[in-house]
Amino acid sequence: YDRICDHAGGRLITNNNGDVICTLHKWQFNPERGTYNSDNVKKETLEYKEIEDHFEVNLSEELIDLPKFTTNKEIEIKFLNHASLLVSTPDFKFATDPWLTGQAFSTGWWLKYKSPMGWEEDLNSCDFIYISHTHPDHLHPETLSYVNKSMPILIADFASQSSENYLNSLGFNNLIKLKHEETLINHKKEIFFSVLKSGDFRDDSGLLLKYGNFSALFNVDSNYLNYFKLPEQLTMVASSFAGGAGSYPVCFENINEKQKSIGQ
């Protein structure tokens, strides 16, 4: 096995008692069973060859090879809210993870910013919407209630079908499902999309875009995305979106301004 913890990408070490634990969240790994004690998650074994008195392990570090598109394309990227961006080009238009109204996590999270006027029209004018995973601040039922049910939705094809099942229950059936590192490509218009899996056991994903000579990675909140096997040079990386989304301290009225400042 490798030393990467499948929970959050931490490092597995052997402590003084001989237990294999993660340095981040103390998950304990049982190498005899190949599972973690914290959850019923099985760790994949490494590919190896036994050569005389040693083992040779296959640790592929191949990076994703983006198409060598060179045309300077027109592209506009607009921040809508939280993890939602609106990407507009002459050839296509899409939005990511739209949470643009209401609350999430049973009123535990609220939007930090006011969504721009006309966001409903923005969403419905898209060619498709990308949704990374099923957390309610990414797959947000109230926001999606404003979207035409025929809208194509791009999702990762998780083995659990978590995104597919949730969207189907909301009335969305025009789903574009991409497996890990599967691509959509149009060589003539120099358009490339690929959905990447998070590097842990959870259902989460990111989106890789190449449009002409412009490239972007929408990491969203995926942990250890594609095991960090990513293109070396990107025009833009979109991540670290969630600051300030919680209700504390901005929604609390029973604490003074000094206490709110300390809370932040």
Q: What role is predicted for each listed range?
A:
Residues Y1-L63, H140:
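Rieske [2Fe-2S] iron-sulfur-binding domain
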Residues Y1-T14, D91-Y130, P141-Y146, Y224-E232:
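Pre-active-site segment of Zn-dependent metallo-hydrolases
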Residues R3, H25-W27, A83, P98-L100, ...:
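Active-site metal-binding loops of divalent metal-dependent hydrolases
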Residues F29-N30, G102-Q103, T134-L139, Q161-S163, ...:
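Active-site environment of divalent metal-dependent phosphoester hydrolases
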Residues G34-S38, H140-S150, N165:
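Metal-dependent catalytic neighborhoods of phosphoester/phosphodiester hydrolases
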Residues N40-K73, I155-N213:
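Metallo-beta-lactamase
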Residues F69-W119, D203-V220, M236:
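Conserved beta-strand hairpin/beta-sheet module of binuclear metal-dependent hydrolase folds
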Residues I155, Y227-Q264:
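Cap/insert and terminal regions of metallo-dependent hydrolase folds
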